[in-house]
Amino acid sequence: MQGRVQPFDPGALAPAQRELFEAIAGGPRAQGPQHFALTRPDGSLRGPFNAFLLAPELGGALQSLGAAIRYRGALTARAREIAILLVAAHWDSEFEREAHQAVGAASGLTPDELAALHDGDPTAFAGDEGVVATATVQLLAGDLDDELWRVASEAIGAEVVFELTTLVGYYSTLALQLRVFRVAP
């Protein structure tokens, strides 16, 4: 698939683009174990991050939101990756799926759990993870019914339901951007 936006040359970025590039390539995503490459061999950004450079102010806000979800949220790593992979399955987002299957495996998701998530199946999970999975599927349909709201707010708390809702919206936005800009994995 030919991308609609060519990779931005890291050596030819405007100041606002350079600042955003550094926040992505040198921020928390670049620290610790790397489960997927943030950059191509030529140093340009991969995935949704290249398109962020089209509008650095908005891209910067998205980058900050994504970093907050990934590194400062209350969801466990497993629960977060369950939700992200269900979003990837819903939107059939190859890049999100590829990137987050590796992160999910590193967070302890088993091959059987990853296969269920690939198929968009939330039933492989129990307890709080089951609540997160079921709530994610409902959120992807556009709402959370009263019964699941009650269960989720009691099990994981209203603040974590807020976080989950934000995560689903953020990764759905990325999936749409990846599709519109024809970003290959």
Locate the predicted segments by residue.
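Mobile cap/lid helix-loop segments that border enzyme active or cofactor-binding sites
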Residues: 1-75
